[in-house]
Design a protein with these regions (language model features):
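Flexible N-terminal pre-Rossmann segment of NAD(P)-dependent oxidoreductases
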Residues: 1-10, 28
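A glycine-rich helix->loop->beta "capping" turn
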Residues: 55-58, 77-91, 97, 108
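A short, exposed helix-loop element centered on a Lys and neighboring polar residues
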Residues: 124-125
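Conserved glycine-rich cofactor-binding loop
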Residues: 8, 15-17
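The beta1-alpha1 cofactor-binding region of Rossmann-like NAD(H)/NADP(H)-dependent oxidoreductases
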Residues: 42, 63-75, 106
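Conserved glycine-rich Rossmann-like NAD(P)H-binding loop of the short-chain dehydrogenase/reductase
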Residues: 31-47
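Substrate-binding pocket helix/loop in short-chain dehydrogenase/reductase
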Residues: 100-101, 105-113
Length: 126
């Protein structure tokens, strides 16, 4: 295990799956704060925040449209206003469309690329 004492960690897509596991591991490793983002299920995000806090870390859940630059900027501003820094960023948010390649519509492909490529780029840049 590693130590994250005093570190502020942000995990996009941290309200479920691998993102949730990483967020909880950061809390278990002594992070000062773990911030998670969610897209649709605020109640699940709140539940994860409560789990994070059982390990002594502060938590915050922020709604994020990962493909939207304004949403990303708002998220970063909220985190910096509350914690003044971000030490660890995990670009975990992502989407997929379950379909055969021939059945994927152009709009679906554009959405996938916006969330999975554009989102991490802008989160890292901001």
């Amino acid at each position: 295990m590693f130590e994250l004492n005093g570190k502020v960690c942000l995990v996009t897509g941290g309200s479920r799956g691998l993102g949730e596991s990483m967020a909880l591991t950061f809390a278990q490793s002594g992070a000062e704060a773990v911030i998670i983002t969610y897209n649709s299920d605020e109640n699940k995000a709140i539940e994860v925040c409560k789990k994070i806090e059982t390990h002594g870390s502060k938590s915050m859940a922020i709604h994020l449209e990962a493909s939207n630059l304004d949403s990303i900027k708002k998220m970063v501003t909220n985190v910096e206003n509350e914690f003044s820094k971000i030490d660890v960023l995990v670009n975990n948010a992502g989407i997929n469309r379950q379909a055969k390649m021939d059945d994927v519509k152009e709009e679906d492909w554009d959405d996938i690329m916006a969330v999975n490529l554009k989102g991490p780029f802008f989160c890292s840049r901001e």
